[in-house]
């Protein structure tokens, strides 16, 4: 018997469980053989404060100090750059404003990323304040915190039944039975399915695929200090990763919850958009994969107790911002579960509670 069972061992569930383990006995159930298998293990792992809806940006900002300072800090400088062709002037102006980016010369852009082809782009903008997040260490440290506080993490524990009882919940997973007073739904793309299994109305979580290719360092260059660079309106992006380059078509195709894989056609189109801005064609892929970014109907995170069943707590709809927002989102969730007044402003909390999605 635990005070709390958390369903889902990605960054959302692990961070929530870590915070809650300071006050409650916690068990995390993850159906895969390892934690962080789905979206969390496939993330491009950037911390960019100005990225997302206003409520997401507020969570990013509230997470910044933790990312910078906790356990020696998880951030390393990366920077962001946007490049655009002449016909995309208007979209470029929009990006400059939304992302707080400084316009730079074409020459400076080519200094930052030497494979860019100056004949192919007209506008460039750069922003120092984009950082790589050490996602693996962040997850491992939350896991350590859970275990230090006596919590359990059970893998290969696919939930097959959830039953409401007078004093809480009974969950059958991986052939074992778990009893808990409260249930945290941190199941990512499967969050609505978990709700339905528990007899709770779904909230309309939509998984969207995001594909990724890893290509060899173009021209064998040392690209450690390159920024992450984007096409305008996030039509593609590229980012250095362990001596290679990640390139994504920035796709958002709606798919069923699944162990996602990259769509070859979507990947090819995205790589072509990237090639349209650089001198070096893509000749081979080292690897390709996809992850699911899961969104609520209004694209804001869903954090807090279900209005019809307060012992069922949503931790869902991270939409690709799971790592960025984890420190503040998990703290808010723990505050709401404990019944203490959250540190975050009341109007922000209202934009995140599941109540907003119930007519």
Walk through the language-model features, giving the residues of each.
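Glycine-rich FAD pyrophosphate-binding loop
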Residues: 21-40
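Helical element adjacent to the flavin cofactor pocket in flavoenzyme catalytic cores
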Residues: 127-181
């Amino acid at each position: 018997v635990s005070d709390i069972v958390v369903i889902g061992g990605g960054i959302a569930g692990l961070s929530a469980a870590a915070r809650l383990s300071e006050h409650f006995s916690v068990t995390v159930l993850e159906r895969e053989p390892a934690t962080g298998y789905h979206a969390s293990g496939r993330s491009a792992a950037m911390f960019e404060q100005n990225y997302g809806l206003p409520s997401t940006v507020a969570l990013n900002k509230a997470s910044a100090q933790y990312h910078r300072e906790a356990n020696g800090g998880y951030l390393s400088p990366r920077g962001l750059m946007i490049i655009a062709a002449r016909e995309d002037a208007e979209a470029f102006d929009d990006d400059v404003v939304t992302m707080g980016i400084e316009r730079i010369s074409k020459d400076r852009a080519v200094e930052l990323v030497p494979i860019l082809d100056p004949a192919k782009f007209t506008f460039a903008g750069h922003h120092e304040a984009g950082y790589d997040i050490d996602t693996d260490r962040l997850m491992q440290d939350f896991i350590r915190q859970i275990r230090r506080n006596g919590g359990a993490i059970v893998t290969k524990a696919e939930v097959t039944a959830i039953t409401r009882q007078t004093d809480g919940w009974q969950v059958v997973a991986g052939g074992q039975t778990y009893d808990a007073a409260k249930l945290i739904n941190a199941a990512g793309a499967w969050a609505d399915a978990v709700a339905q299994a528990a007899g709770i109305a779904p909230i309309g979580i939509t998984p969207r695929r995001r594909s990724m290719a890893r290509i060899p360092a173009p021209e064998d260059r040392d690209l450690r200090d390159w920024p992450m660079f984007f096409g305008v309106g996030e039509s593609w992006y590229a980012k250095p990763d362990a001596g290679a380059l990640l390139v994504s078509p920035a796709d958002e195709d709606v798919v069923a919850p699944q162990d996602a894989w990259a769509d070859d056609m979507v990947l090819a189109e995205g790589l072509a958009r990237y090639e349209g801005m650089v001198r070096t064609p893509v000749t081979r892929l080292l690897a390709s994969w996809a992850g699911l970014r899961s969104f609520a109907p209004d694209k804001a995170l869903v954090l807090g107790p279900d209005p019809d069943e307060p012992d069922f707590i949503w931790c869902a709809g991270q939409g690709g911002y799971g790592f960025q927002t984890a420190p503040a989102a998990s703290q808010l969730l723990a505050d709401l579960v404990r019944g203490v007044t959250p540190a975050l402003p009341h109007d922000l909390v209202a934009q995140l509670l599941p109540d907003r999605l119930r007519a």
